[in-house]
Design a protein with these regions (language model features):
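Terminal RNA-binding accessory module
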Residues: 1, 19, 376-468
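Conserved, mostly hydrophobic/aromatic
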Residues: 191, 211, 228, 264, ...
Length: 468
């Protein structure tokens, strides 16, 4: 495949560093405070780290209080209606902080902002919002913010710039435990329910040398867990035109010396390969964890979703993956109540879940996204009926998860301690190599470290144990 993406020229990126310096000088007498609120997926988390990096280069400090913030950035998600409603609710609340501080600059970015109808709604109904820009304009954030300050006008930048990759942006990563590394952007799959290809553009792969250098630096800086991000990591490299694929990238990353784990998300079954599973099985650093969204256990529904695989293909993939990785932790996504789905078809999905026995399942009732083919499909089944199917699915999966977790009681697992808990009995949280949540004993000295945890109890959602 001919490569369609281009790197943003270094001169244009340097221009953004100049705007950062100008903004820092502009506010030298009183450095501004910024708040970045992130909605949605890990790709948005990674994008917010770049936004924070640029804000810090402008001289900003950070706050969690909107009333104290001079710059507020909402990095939004367009995948589901619930996330959009939360964003609009937050925008409404910001009218009060803007009245109290008229100089406050409010920015809306991310996938919602890329949708023309959202940008127009904000333009007309949320006039206190100063800056709106989509994911493809993230690298121009300093210039856009400079325009807001110097031209004293609202700025909208949602142009279609699907072919651009920006390297070398400043970044702020919290702590030294986990890091997110984008290896590609966009999606070519056009699942009929999904808005992502319309707001994040077509697939563009970063050069492998850039990714390897970034991961090597993170390991040298002491990061313990690095997650490789892409809407479909299994199609990484197709646009490079070299034959170098995701399995090759994992092979090269695994050569980096250090005490760390590599994870990745998300995967598309149509592009998953035996080669990838063989590389995972043989690697020293790649977690034996696979998130492989199935979405439905009914072939007809999969076709309606424009998911180009069938149930037999999916089962073949996971059978092979489990054969070469007996300790594999397998998770998935399922949508219940897709337009036109019948109860018997929904129960095919439940039957698949019973057969596969996923370690965990992320389940959703269909949420129509304006601008997608599925939003125009006839959907005669009432929400109450879909909820009944959904509850049945969740009950089955919860039983499976509880049973699988119970098998770990009495074992000692190596875990990365990554957070603190409000529960005095279990003051720390950790993750196993397979990504299972563990609540455990310990103190702050354990944060960011690998520890052996003796599992003493479990429930549907987590394990519990003591650090040995």
């Amino acid at each position: 495949m001919e490569r369609t993406q281009v790197q943003i020229p270094a001169a244009q990126l340097d221009r953004q560093r100049d705007f950062e310096a100008k903004l820092k000088e502009m506010h030298a007498d009183r450095p501004p405070r910024a708040l970045v609120d992130t909605f949605g997926c890990q790709q948005n988390v990674a994008d917010s780290q770049y936004i924070m990096g640029m804000l810090r280069a402008m001289g900003c400090s950070f706050t969690d209080d909107p009333a104290q913030a001079d710059v507020v950035v909402l990095n939004t998600c367009a995948i589901r209606d619930h996330a959009e409603k939360r964003v609009y609710g937050n925008l409404g609340a910001l009218t009060h902080t803007k009245k109290a501080n008229p100089q406050q600059v409010i920015c809306l970015c991310g996938c919602m902002a890329q949708r023309p109808e959202v940008a127009e709604k904000v333009r007309q109904s949320y006039r206190h919002v100063d800056l709106v820009f989509g994911p493809q304009a993230l690298w121009k954030f300093p210039e856009l913010l400079y325009q807001v300050y110097t031209q004293r006008r609202r700025v909208f930048s949602v142009a279609d710039e699907h072919g651009a990759i920006a390297e070398g942006m400043p970044v702020v990563r919290e702590g030294r435990t986990r890091a997110w590394v984008s290896i590609m952007y966009g999606c070519n799959n056009f699942c009929s329910y999904c808005i992502v290809p319309y707001v994040r553009g077509r697939e563009r792969s970063r050069d492998p040398e850039r990714i390897i250098d970034e991961v090597r630096e993170l390991v040298a800086d002491g990061f313990r867990e690095i997650t490789l991000l892409g809407q479909n990591v299994n199609s990484y490299g197709k646009d490079l035109g070299t034959g170098y694929d995701f399995a090759d990238l994992l092979t090269d990353l695994d050569k980096i010396e250090g005490d760390y784990l590599l994870r990745f998300m998300s995967s598309q079954p149509k592009d998953a390969t035996y080669k990838l599973f063989d590389v995972m099985a043989a690697s020293r650093h790649v977690a034996k964890q696979l998130h492989l969204p199935v979405q439905s256990g009914c072939d007809r529904v999969l076709r309606a979703m424009n998911r180009p695989y069938d149930v037999a293909r999916y089962l073949d993939l996971i059978t092979y993956a489990r054969r070469v990785m007996p300790d594999l932790v397998l998770t998935s996504d399922v949508i219940i109540g897709f337009p036109g789905e019948t109860e018997s078809e929904a129960m095919e999905t439940v039957a698949l879940v019973e057969k596969v026995r996923f370690d965990a399942l992320f389940t959703f009732i269909f949420s129509p996204r304006p601008g997608t083919p599925a939003a125009k499909m006839e959907d005669p089944v009432p929400r109450e009926e879909k909820q009944r199917w959904f509850d049945r699915l969740c009950a089955v999966q919860n039983g499976i998860s509880e049973e699988l977790h119970r098998q770990y009681v009495g074992q000692t697992l190596r875990c990365l301690v990554d957070g603190e808990s409000d529960d005095a009995r279990w003051p720390l949280t950790a993750r196993t190599a397979g990504g299972r949540l563990v609540h455990c004993t310990g103190d702050r000295a354990d944060l960011g470290e690998y520890r052996d945890v003796k599992i003493t109890d479990s429930n549907t959602w987590a394990l519990f144990g003591t650090i040995e």
